[in-house]
């Protein structure tokens, strides 16, 4: 769902998304051949300003999200604003990703941490 005029969500070929909430205030790019499991949430903004008087009138700062090709995001994961997930990476189920993940890595946890390179 694009929450403001001009926001973009781009989803590549052969990407499968199951029961996931995607909110774009700016831009979210999801590559080709990705698997995004059920109950994931992908937000490029916190959805509101932290100042009490501006919560209903100001969406806060949006930061683009980029998910590369052939990424697998496990169920119940949350991808936060400004994150990039490199191609061929895996995000473990239930992770909260608040920092970028390089290509060909497995990350998991809350907050998500790099676990290992996929080829190790």
Language-model-detected regions and their locations in the chain:
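Flexible, glycine/small-residue-enriched loop-and-beta-strand segment within the central core
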Residues: 1-79, 83, 117-119
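Active-site-proximal glycine-rich helix-loop-beta segment
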Residues: 38, 93-94
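Extended beta-solenoid/beta-helix repeat architectures
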Residues: 84-86, 101
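Short helix N-cap motif at coil->helix boundaries in the Bergerat
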Residues: 99, 116
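Multi-pass alpha-helical transporter architecture, strongest
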Residues: 112-114
């Amino acid at each position: 769902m694009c929450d403001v005029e001009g926001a973009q969500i781009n989803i590549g070929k052969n990407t499968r998304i199951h029961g996931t909430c995607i909110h774009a205030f700016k831009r979210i790019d999801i590559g080709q051949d990705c698997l995004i499991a059920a109950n994931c949430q992908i937000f490029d903004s916190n959805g509101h300003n932290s100042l009490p008087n501006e919560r209903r009138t100001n969406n806060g700062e949006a930061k683009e999200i980029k998910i590369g090709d052939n990424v697998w995001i496990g169920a119940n994961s949350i991808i936060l604003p400004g994150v990039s997930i490199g191609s061929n990476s895996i995000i473990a189920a239930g992770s909260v990703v608040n920092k970028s993940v390089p290509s060909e890595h497995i990350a998991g946890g809350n907050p998500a941490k790099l676990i290992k390179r996929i080829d190790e």
